[in-house]
From Swiss-Prot:
Keyword Repeat carried by entry: yes
Classification lineage: Eukaryota, Metazoa, Chordata, Craniata, Vertebrata
Gene: pum2
Domain notes: The pumilio repeats mediate the association with RNA by packing together to form a right-handed superhelix that approximates a half donut. RNA-binding occurs on the concave side of the surface. Pum2 is composed of 8 pumilio repeats of 36 residues; each repeat binds a single nucleotide in its RNA target. Residues at positions 12 and 16 of the pumilio repeat bind each RNA base via hydrogen bonding or van der Waals contacts with the Watson-Crick edge, while the amino acid at position 13 makes a stacking interaction.
Organism whose genome encodes this protein: Xenopus laevis (African clawed frog)
A GO CC term assigned to this protein in UniProt: cytoplasm
Subunit structure: Component of a complex with papd4, sympk, tacc3, parn, dazl and cpeb1.
Stated name of the protein: Pumilio homolog 2
Amino acid sequence: MNVPCVVGMNEVAWQESRGIMHASSGQEALGVGVGMVPSGVSSAGQAHGNNPHAMPPGAPSAQVPLSGRSQDDATVGYFFQRQAGEQLNGYSNKHRWPTGDSIDAAVRSVDEMNHDFQALALESRGMGELLPAKKFWEHEDPAKDGQKGMFLADEWRENTWGASHHSMSQPIMVQRRPGQGFHGNHDVASVLSPRSESGGLGVSMVEYVLSSSPADKLDPRFRKGVFSVRDCELDGPEKGEQKCKASPFEEEKKRDLISADTDNVSKLNGRGLPNGIESDCKDFNRTPGSRQASPTEITERIGPNSISAEVLGQHQNPMSNKPLSDEFPSTESQNLDGMEQVGLHSLQFDYPGNQIQMDSAGAGVGLFDYNTQQQMFQRQNALTVQQLTAAQQQQQQFTLAAAQQPHLAGMFSTGLAPAAFVPNPYIISAGHPGADPYTTLAGPAVVSPQYYGIPWGVYPAGLFQQQAAAAAQAANSNNQQAATQASQGQQQVMRATSNQRPLTPNQAQQGQQPESLAAANQAQIFGQGLATSMPGYQLLTPTAYYDQTGALVVGPGARAGLAAQVRLVASAPVLLSPAAAQAATATGANSLTGATNGMFRQMGPQQQQQQQQQQHQQQQQQPNANLHSNSFYGNSTMSNNSQSSSLFSPGPGQPGSTSLGFGSSNSLGAAIGSAFGGFGSSVGNSAGSSGSRRDSLSASCDLYKRSSSSLAAIGQPYYNSLGFSSSPSPISMPLPSQTSGHSLTPPPSLSSHGSSSSLHLGGLTNGSGRYFSAAPGAEAKYRSAANTSSFFSSNSQLFPPSRLRYNRADIMPSGRSRLLEDFRNNRFPNLQLRDLMGHIVEFSQDQHGSRFIQQKLERASPAERQLVFSEILQAAYQLMTDVFGNYVIQKFFEFGSMDQKLALATRIRGHVLPLALQMYGCRVIQKALESISTDQQSEMVRELDGHVLKCVKDQNGNHVVQKCIECVTPQSLHFIIEAFKGQVYVLSTHPYGCRVIQRILEHCTPEQTLPILEELHQSTEQLVQDQYGNYVIQHVLEHGRSDDKSKIVCEVRGQVLVLSQHKFASNVVEKCVTHSSRTERAFLIDEICCQNDGPHSALYTMMKDQYANYVVQKMIDMAEPAQRKIIMHKIRPHITTLRKYTYGKHILAKLEKYYMKNSPDLGLLVGPSNGML
């Protein structure tokens, strides 16, 4: 099996067989790069345990052990690339950390990482040159050279592992603490590495790549990076007799530690591999600079069952030596390496240069490092007075800066303020119910580089400023236990109970009742310290946690079963200002209701009083901050002239509404309340002061309304919004209304301007609701599919909306709403009528939207038709005159119920004349006349009385009058006949009037048509030759009575030759020949056969004429046989001549049709078709 790997930018292949390779010319014929193995050499010939090594050029060949791989793996510059075919192997009994997460893995900027990775790949001395290498270790007697510890200075045999020849001065993604190395060596320069002076990162990358390479028979001592005498392939006495030569790195290792590689020791590092792949005996792991600390060296430093004093600052992990819960089923010891301070360089976003610096809160991982100075991790054993004072002053400076510079004010709402107190342990949050950390990912498209360096469900506890809890202590003198617990910060929040996964929003939170007093205390602490009436900072609360005594403390509301655990995580620590804590003490002292003020909407008469107090405090505390804000969750009885601003709004809120909370025009009541427990369900459904029900996330929510602010808070589009997540990735879910004009540039890897990249709640879907793996590299395969996924789409698996969450105020530059724009761009292939609520009128006025509605209305249910009808009824007249909207109205006249037709007819009433004269309204009138009842028809037609001639002569109105004549009973049309008196000739010669005259002749009674026909007979000669009047005469010949036809024929007789050569009259002559009686037809034919036109007969003249030849053809068709014989004899002398004329050929073609059979009495009248006689 060949697995490709990148070596020095050359593609090579690993060979499964490890044959012995011999060197030629003093150097081995390396398998790397050549991809070949000498035939005849069996892999069984090598001794178990031989490590890959190679002989450097020029070295004596006597000391070169034969090996399967001819070159040391770590000396080759590997490009940092995961094996594409590697898949997760399951998590039944291993550590279940999320893929890609590592506790000590830090993040650096994308540009820097790309540069360093490429530098490693290009570090090879030549594209084809093979670097010198040496063996890492081999089997030999440990007592031969004595015990040697790992990573002692200058232990490399040759300069390959000597002084660094890499251009980097520090390892990638590692910042060293001054004066201390990773392995206890205080001289950083003495730690040597193949790729850098202090980290050995290049080797760790080699491990990372080689860990997934196929190595069926690799020595088992490499299992989990431990050098041991264990052998996966040897059992019984053979295993006990196997001896190994100590590695140069571990020559001073204690003998008792050599045999200490048991399962517990091998699994000392509880994190497993960084990508979550299960390690086995085939893994190649331990080299200098490995990402996993060596178990042996950890054992040397801290012992096999103790945890480093540097882990999590001063706090120990209570769960480290306990059997884990169902989330982490492994019963192994969970010992973590010492945490190293790692900083993140400035993000590649357009933040200002003078960003506010902040400490890494509690985790020892620098989440942010903003170009100012690096905040090293400080161990805080106690809160001194100087720290309290300095923190208060620093917070006051930030508040003053926000007041003076409004554009920086938003930084405080996203947690970009320094953490003054960081004695908290990790907090394990409650994930989304049923969510699996291995199948969920909270980014819209790709994995953002801002991952927490901690496992799933755990995030730094610096999100809660302890000063707020300490301030709340003054108001809770009767609850000293809970206050002490909060001030000490010894909190470890867990998911739910130890044996229970999060419940659904409608289920009771069972198993969370025992600690009622602690929960009540916690409710006061969070109510006062975290959700005061002070606006500004983003809040986060756990669902439950263990206090210092081991008691399970459940967050307020969660015990009542009002909401399931929905994780709300920001990408930065979220702090409370000291002013907020002071305000909590002032407003909520000795009062539980005051403690929860600002956190939940007040229930009862005290609500307005609390809101007035909040507004009064805000006016005093922030007179110049340009943040006209209410309490964090807003008020539900705000005045119309008030403004609100919320952390979750992309700018100042709309007047008279709240951007987040329980306001009367807002329904996102329990966005964070779902984590608190709230007064609502998982995502709202809270009631306003009026008591009316509002659907969650309705279109009235200000989250989806455009903000008048031109510059939102820094980082707001991807740190705010609905922070639902079951993954430790940063919350970066912009709302549909957020465009580039509303905020600074979002993270480059996230799509923030499409409704299709909105919120991903609980998992990563491919747009059709199907989940797929969130394993490293999987996002690239589904990146395009993830971009089309949307929390607001109609196929959402978690919260199927009743309709798409679009707001009518969200207008695109084209003038269309975002929903219509997305529909026109084919982003909603399964759009339904119910998804268009609020947009029916707009869609009806769009070409594609109107066609969509028309098609749906034909097959829609009565309920769906009524939904559409309720919206278009108010804009009925507007749609009737719209180029596309009129078709929707017509569809309702065609497929609507009688009540709907009656309602639309009522809308037409009083507007018949203007609609009849309008280009599109006239179509609606015509469709209405076809659909409504007789009484409604008569009522509608009467509006045209007095305006008949105006409508008849109008290009649109004439169609309405024609439809009236066709559909309405003749008795109701008497006013139209009266209007035509004395105007028949004029109207007959009118392009539109002639049509109305024909409709009258077709549908009206004889009594009504008689006066019209009398006027027509008086002007027959003129009308016959008129371009429009001839149609009226033809219509009388076709549909009139016999008397009327005879009168017209009499007018034509004697003028057949002349009228037949007229462009318009020739049509009337043809109709006379066709519809006249046999006697009248004979007179007309004899007239052309007997009449002479100069030297030739009239028939010859007519055969050559462009119009009269059609009359001759019609006579041949309609003539009696005797007359037809006469016509043939008259035509025969002119056959040769007719071939010279274009129109004469038409006559010859007609003759061929009837007489090609060579009638015996006529003989051969027509020659061959080729013209030869």
